[in-house]
Amino acid sequence: MSQQREPKPRPAPGADPETEPYWKATHEGRLMVQRCTACGAHQLYPRWRCLRCRGQVEWVDAGGGGTVYSFTVIRQNFSRSFRHLIPYVVALVDLDEGPRLMTNLVGIEPDDVRIGMRVRARFERVSEDASIPLFEPDPASA
């Protein structure tokens, strides 16, 4: 007989100097991206310089809206942090500001997810001092 173990919480992100502003904002319920001060391009994952022109970047609040670019449904996972969530959706979301973010879609049955659907950010606390962005269907687009 196999022994059932309690699910573990989702892993908390590890912040470094480049990502600390991002993770601090998510814990406050805000989504941030970097914007180039020279060309205005937005980017995420954080970097020291603009990917387009190598200019300086600054952190700006993102609106939290986006569109599903692609997704997959996870139906098997052996990690105690995720096994209890099965089935769950991992998606690439194109933020309205431009960057593409890998995330989980929540609040929707996996069979109802569609490429091109509008979603919005919400935040899940995963530890005392960390939250992660997840996305859910945007009711304004229904």
Model-derived regions, located:
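Short, basic/aromatic beta-hairpin or loop at an interaction surface
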Residues: 85-101
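Cys/His-rich microdomains that often coordinate metals
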Residues: 42-43, 57
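Residues immediately within or flanking Cys/His clusters that coordinate Zn2+
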Residues: 30-33, 47
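A broadly conserved sequence feature marking short terminus-proximal activation segments
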Residues: 1-31, 141-142
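Well-ordered alpha/beta subsegment
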Residues: 4, 98, 103-142
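Short, conserved beta-turn/loop elements at beta-strand boundaries and strand-helix junctions
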Residues: 71-77, 124-128
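Short, cysteine/histidine-rich loop/knuckle motifs that typically chelate Zn2+
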Residues: 35-38, 49-52
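Conserved hydrophobic positions within beta-strands
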Residues: 66-68, 105
